[in-house]
């Protein structure tokens, strides 16, 4: 292996895509489930340069002949370059997080900062916050240690913090929908930053947006930025305009990885358009109504007849949440998807929602669709739900 990534679990890593998009060299993902395997790999030194992820960012320091002062202060190395058999260690997570905050206008000067979590990324983000002038940096833990000044999540709400940084895996794929901090009860918040990048918007970020926090941003751009800066170490050269490269690759990744969800009135053409778009874009096509039928074993009219609309909506939400957390799909949604806010949240977390708008007189009536059995039903549905489609 010349270039690559080592870590215990790499199944959902974007690093290969980013590095090969950026530089064109072959980049391997090398999962090393045990410490023994990691030590054996590092001892052999059969690579030009590697990135290191959880849980080996501290362990790798034992094998480095040189460690960058910033990486040494943080206590973690995520980038290693082999120079004639000697390993040089750096921390580009610091640079990536710093870029993310600068790019989105996060102002640390004089602010109180809450960092959720006590793991390795806590030290990185804390260093950035302090270096950028934070007045106070507080640590939040599910099991706080009072002797270390750590806060519980309940105490954090009344801390008066202006900035929240999540460094925990809460809300990360596949366990999406988790949020441990009540940001809606924190009126002084100016920014919420989550280092988690999958899904694109964690539950924490969605709640921050709903609460009107001015800056609410996930970790994808940080991931790309640290990779760009790592590649500079790999190749021993600077990119002409690193911020431009970071924006370009972040945008390309987001276009490629996010879902496209089609919503609109019943019979507005979502399924037909969806199949065409999925084929054109090379995406997996998902029709949520079809998935409900597959899972339940009954037709939609039969489900309505047996369980009513509430029973059907419960099944619809389950399928929306199942597919909404995945990526690279074209999702066609039922006409009533907007009736439950949690459906839109599930679609927003990892996707772009497009509203297919057609006039009522152009829509087909009936066809076994309980909500559109007549023109009167259509007109009533459109009058009452257009605002929800445009949310």
Go through each PLM region and give its residues.
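Glycine-rich adenosine-cofactor-binding loop
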Residues: 7, 91, 110-130, 264-266
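Adenosine-phosphate binding glycine-rich loop
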Residues: 195-257
């Amino acid at each position: 292996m010349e270039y690559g990534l080592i870590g215990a679990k790499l199944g959902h890593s974007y690093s290969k895509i980013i590095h090969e998009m950026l530089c064109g060299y072959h980049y391997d993902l090398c999962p090393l489930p045990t410490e023994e395997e990691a030590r054996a790999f590092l001892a052999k030194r059969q690579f030009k340069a590697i990135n290191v992820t959880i849980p080996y960012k501290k362990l790798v320091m034992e094998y480095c002949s040189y460690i960058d002062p910033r990486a040494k202060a943080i206590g973690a190395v995520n980038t290693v370059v082999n120079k004639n058999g000697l390993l040089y260690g750096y921390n580009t997570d610091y640079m990536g997080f710093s870029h993310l905050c600068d790019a989105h206008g996060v102002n640390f000067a004089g602010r109180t900062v809450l960092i959720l979590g006590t793991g390795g990324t806590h030290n990185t983000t804390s260093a950035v916050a302090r270096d950028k002038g934070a007045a106070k940096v507080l640590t939040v833990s599910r099991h706080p240690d009072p002797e270390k000044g750590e806060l519980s999540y309940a105490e954090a709400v009344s801390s008066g913090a202006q900035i929240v940084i999540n460094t925990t895996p809460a809300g990360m794929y596949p366990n999406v929908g988790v949020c441990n901090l009540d940001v809606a009860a924190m009126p002084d918040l100016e920014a919420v930053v989550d280092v988690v990048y999958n899904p694109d918007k964690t539950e924490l970020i969605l709640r921050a947006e709903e609460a009107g926090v001015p800056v609410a941003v996930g970790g994808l751009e940080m991931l790309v930025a640290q990779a760009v800066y790592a590649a500079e170490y790999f190749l021993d050269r600077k990119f002409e305009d690193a911020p431009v490269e970071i924006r370009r690759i972040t945008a390309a990744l987001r276009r490629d990885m996010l879902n496209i969800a089609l919503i609109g009135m019943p019979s507005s053409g979502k399924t037909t358009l969806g199949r065409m778009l999925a084929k054109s874009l090379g995406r997996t096509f998902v029709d949520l109504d079809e998935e409900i039928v597959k899972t339940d074993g009954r037709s939609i009219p039969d489900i309505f007849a047996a369980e009513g609309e509430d029973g059907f909506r419960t099944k619809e939400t389950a399928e929306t949440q199942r597919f909404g957390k995945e990526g690279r799909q074209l999702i066609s949604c039922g006409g009533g998807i907007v009736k439950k806010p949690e459906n839109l949240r599930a679609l927003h977390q990892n996707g772009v929602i497009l509203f297919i708008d057609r006039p009522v007189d152009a829509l087909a009536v009936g066809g076994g669709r309980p909500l559109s059995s007549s023109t009167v039903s259509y007109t009533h549905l459109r009058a009452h739900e257009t605002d929800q489609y445009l949310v």
